[in-house]
């Protein structure tokens, strides 16, 4: 930790190895993953110098070395540290992801600066520093208009980077499934009750049940048996309810579903990733507790891909409706538009340097 602080105050000479690279700053793991679809494309065209702020991000980013050439903590926000960092690395440009308004970084560096996935809050620091960026790509046109009143010049809207699909290969299974992902204790009963009702009409339908915490798989399996369901564990597909007791495959399971249900939304958790199933053209249902994913919820409802239900009765009604009529989900198309817009603006700017 002391060494990390020293590197922030007195950036390392080894930065000279990354001279002329494109400097990308993603403060945390969340910002890195949000920007990753764009970073993958930029890495094909530029050497990348990646900086981070969160100490937790360092260990995670070490496992993602395919996407950068040099990794260094963000210099401390004082004139000496940021100037030394720039002097050693001589970057081609700086891309700042989201709302990293560090005054010394933005004021005392001479490198061309780009702000991406930005949104307007109207804070004083935002009003002062936004005009220091040479290119700003924002989430909405309303954000653009607000930043223009602050004196920002080259400002565009491309949408929210969080809405870009990041799909895996997907798993192929025979049968008809509802996939319930990231389910917490306290909401599993709601889903099992609704599924029991749906099975009266759709007897061949199966439920793939993925707990948020894998250690709950056996508890959920017992609850399913208590409801009278035949159960099995993935990859055995003989049960009416198939429990998943392994990490990291939920994203790959969504494409087998006719419908997805995302957890953390029927209890007061705030929701998990609502986007993943819709990237495969699968409609997603969620409960009323979505305060952590409101931006995704609003986007999906606008695209006709997301559906909120308040209780078990509404869940049965919505499942019946979506099972009876094939719904066309075009989220991936919208995702490609957003990604294409960001890449077009960034490439155009970088070509001009």
Curated annotation (Swiss-Prot):
Its main location: membrane. It is a peripheral membrane protein. GO terms for molecular function: Kdo transferase activity; transferase activity. One of its GO terms (cellular component) is plasma membrane. Changing residue 212 to A: Decrease in catalytic activity. Highly thermostable. Does not lose activity after 16 hours at 70 or 80 degrees Celsius, but incubation of the enzyme at 90 and 99 degrees Celsius for 1 hour results in gradual loss of activity. CMP binds at residues 211-212, 247-249, 273-276. The record marks 98, 162 as: Transition state stabilizer. It is an enzyme of class 2 (transferase). Pathway: Bacterial outer membrane biogenesis; LPS core biosynthesis. The keyword Membrane applies. One of its GO terms (biological process) is lipid A biosynthetic process. It is found in: Cell inner membrane. Keywords: Cell inner membrane, Cell membrane, Lipopolysaccharide biosynthesis, Membrane, Transferase. Its EC number is 2.4.99.12. The keyword Transferase applies. It catalyses: lipid IVA (E. coli) + CMP-3-deoxy-beta-D-manno-octulosonate = alpha-Kdo-(2->6)-lipid IVA (E. coli) + CMP + H(+). InterPro entries: Glycos_transf_N, Glycos_transf_N_sf, Kdotransferase. The active site is at 31 (proton acceptor). Changing residue 162 to A: Large decrease in catalytic activity. Can form homodimer, homotrimer and homotetramer. Involved in lipopolysaccharide (LPS) biosynthesis. Catalyzes the transfer of a single 3-deoxy-D-manno-octulosonate (Kdo) residue from CMP-Kdo to lipid IV(A), the tetraacyldisaccharide-1,4'-bisphosphate precursor of lipid A. Is strictly monofunctional, i.e. is capable of adding only a single Kdo residue to the acceptor lipid. Belongs to the glycosyltransferase group 1 family. Glycosyltransferase 30 subfamily. This is 3-deoxy-D-manno-octulosonic acid transferase. The lineage of its organism: Bacteria, Pseudomonadati, Aquificota, Aquificia, Aquificales. The gene is kdtA.
């Amino acid at each position: 930790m002391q060494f990390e602080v020293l590197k922030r105050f007195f950036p390392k000479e080894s930065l000279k190895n990354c001279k002329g690279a494109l400097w990308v700053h993603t403060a945390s793991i969340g910002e890195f993953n949000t920007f990753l679809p764009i970073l993958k494309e930029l890495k094909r065209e530029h050497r990348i110098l990646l900086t981070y702020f969160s100490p937790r991000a360092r260990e995670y980013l070490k496992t993602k070395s395919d996407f950068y050439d040099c990794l260094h903590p963000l210099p401390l926000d004082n004139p000496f540290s940021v100037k030394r960092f720039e002097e050693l690395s001589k970057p081609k440009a700086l891309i700042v992801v989201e709302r990293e308004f560090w005054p010394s970084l933005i004021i005392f560096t001479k490198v061309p600066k780009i702000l991406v996935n930005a949104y307007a809050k109207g804070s004083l620091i935002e009003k002062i520093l936004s005009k220091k960026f040479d290119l700003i790509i924002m989430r909405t046109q309303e954000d653009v208009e607000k930043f223009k009143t602050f004196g920002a010049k080259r400002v565009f809207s491309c949408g929210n980077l969080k809405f870009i699909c990041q799909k895996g290969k997907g798993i192929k299974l025979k049968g008809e499934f509802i996939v319930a992902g990231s389910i917490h204790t306290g909401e599993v009963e709601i889903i099992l009750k609704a599924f029991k009702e749906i099975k009266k009409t759709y007897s061949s339908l199966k439920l793939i049940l993925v707990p948020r915490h894998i250690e709950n798989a056996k508890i959920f399996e017992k609850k399913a048996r208590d409801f009278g369901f035949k159960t099995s564990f993935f990859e055995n597909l003989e049960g009416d309810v198939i429990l998943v007791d392994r990490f990291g495959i939920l994203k790959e399971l969504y494409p087998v579903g006719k419908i997805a249900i995302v957890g953390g939304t029927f209890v007061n958790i705030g929701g998990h990733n609502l986007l993943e199933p819709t990237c495969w053209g699968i409609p997603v249902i969620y409960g009323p507790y979505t305060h952590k994913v409101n931006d995704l919820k609003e986007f999906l409802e606008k695209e006709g891909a997301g559906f909120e239900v308040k209780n078990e009765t509404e869940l049965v009604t919505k499942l019946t409706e979506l099972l009876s009529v094939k719904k066309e989900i075009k989220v991936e198309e919208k995702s490609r538009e957003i990604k294409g817009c960001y890449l077009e603006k960034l490439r155009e700017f970088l070509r001009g340097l």
